[in-house]
């Protein structure tokens, strides 16, 4: 399919958000403390680099998601606001120590690390990521670690190296339905992502595996349901579903604003497949990740668990 045949619309829907997408910004002392702690260490976060709409919410409760292996990506996905580069800097050998110092200062018990895609590195950056994780285990031995990883270009050895580092959650997002993947994700495929998730689930059956999708890109209800089934069939345990919001006019336009009732419906569909679903307009992969982790851990030892407020 050529660019002219892309199913993604050229124009965005009206810029005015529906009422369920309007939120108060909880700025205050805690937000300022988090901001200072992160900036004093010179650490990039996906909260800032990807222009996440939840930054003020998360930072106001002393949580943040660290962006590892630099602040520029070797892929240029149409939905993402992280800078693109063909020649990224080498991994910082002190990055793990910097993240550990920041996490200590914030009092984090559950540390979430995501990464830029590093197709310039032989193992996609897995070794550098493992070094960070090992440092965190040493400096914060009681903290749990969640990693949102790239697809490592399908490198299974790199994946296993990461999984051997004793993480609590392995997260890899399919991002959208299969039909839209070529137009949303640069140099990635839907089936390769499913393969990585399935391999992780088989390699460590007790590991919490997680993935996420955005809605509002022009997907059909039937496609979302199929995606949830695909994720369940490939060993995923946790799925996040959130509204795609266009970071700038350079990015893929929003096709629709999905109602809270539709998110509730998708949650019920996923739960019927045995998935642990966290869905809502502002939900992102790492949004309330600590609470989702605790709820999932409770579910594994009981018949029910409460999710944090989805809005």
Swiss-Prot record:
Q: Which Pfam families match?
A: LIAS_N (PF16881), Radical_SAM (PF04055)
Question: Would you say which domain of life the source belongs to?
Answer: Bacteria
Gene name tied to this protein: lipA
Q: Which PANTHER family does the entry mention?
A: LIPOYL SYNTHASE, LIPOYL SYNTHASE, MITOCHONDRIAL
Which residues take part in binding [4Fe-4S] cluster 2?
Answer: 73, 77, 80
What pathway is it annotated to?
Answer: Protein modification; protein lipoylation via endogenous pathway; protein N(6)-(lipoyl)lysine from octanoyl-[acyl-carrier-protein]: step 2/2
Gene Ontology MF terms = 4 iron, 4 sulfur cluster binding; lipoate synthase activity; metal ion binding
Q: Which UniProt keywords apply?
A: 4Fe-4S, Cytoplasm, Iron, Iron-sulfur, Metal-binding, S-adenosyl-L-methionine, Transferase
Task: List, alphabetically, the GO terms of the cellular component aspect.
Answer: cytoplasm
Instruction: Report the cofactors.
Output: [4Fe-4S] cluster
Q: What is its EC number?
A: 2.8.1.8
Q: What is its main location?
A: cytoplasm
| UniProt domain Radical SAM core: residue ranges | 59-276
Entry cofactor note text? Binds 2 [4Fe-4S] clusters per subunit. One cluster is coordinated with 3 cysteines and an exchangeable S-adenosyl-L-methionine.
Q: What is the organism field in this record?
A: Chlamydia trachomatis serovar D (strain ATCC VR-885 / DSM 19411 / UW-3/Cx)
Q: What is this protein called?
A: Lipoyl synthase
């Amino acid at each position: 399919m050529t660019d002219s045949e892309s199913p993604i619309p050229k124009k965005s829907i009206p810029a005015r958000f529906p009422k369920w997408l309007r939120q108060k910004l909880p700025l205050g002392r805690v937000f300022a403390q988090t901001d200072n702690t992160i900036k004093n260490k010179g650490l990039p976060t996906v909260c800032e680099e990807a222009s996440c709409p939840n930054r003020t919410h998360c930072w106001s409760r002393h949580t943040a998601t660290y962006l590892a292996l630099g602040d520029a990506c070797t892929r240029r996905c149409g939905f993402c606001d992280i800078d693109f580069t063909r020649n990224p800097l080498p991994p910082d050998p002190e990055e793990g120590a910097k993240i550990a110092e920041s996490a200590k200062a914030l009092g984090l018990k559950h540390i979430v690390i995501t990464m830029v895609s590093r197709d310039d590195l032989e193992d996609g950056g897995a070794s550098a990521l493992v070094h960070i994780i090992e440092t965190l285990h040493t400096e914060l031995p009681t903290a749990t670690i969640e990693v949102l990883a790239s697809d490592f270009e399908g490198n299974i050895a790199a994946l296993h190296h990461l999984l051997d580092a004793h993480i609590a959650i392995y997260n890899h997002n399919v991002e959208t339905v299969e039909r839209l993947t070529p137009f949303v994700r640069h140099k990635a495929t839907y089936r390769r992502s499913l393969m990585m998730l399935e391999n992780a689930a088989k390699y460590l059956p007790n590991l919490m595996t997680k993935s996420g999708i955005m809605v509002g890109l022009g997907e059909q209800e039937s496609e979302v349901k199929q995606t949830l089934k695909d994720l369940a069939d490939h060993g995923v345990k946790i799925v996040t579903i959130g509204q795609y919001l266009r970071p700038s006019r350079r990015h893929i336009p929003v096709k629709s604003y999905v109602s809270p009732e539709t998110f509730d419906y998708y949650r019920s569909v996923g739960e019927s497949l045995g998935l642990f679903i966290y869905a809502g307009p502002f939900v992102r992969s790492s949004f309330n990740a600590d609470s989702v982790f605790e709820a999932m851990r409770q579910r594994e030892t009981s018949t029910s668990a409460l999710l944090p407020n989805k809005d």
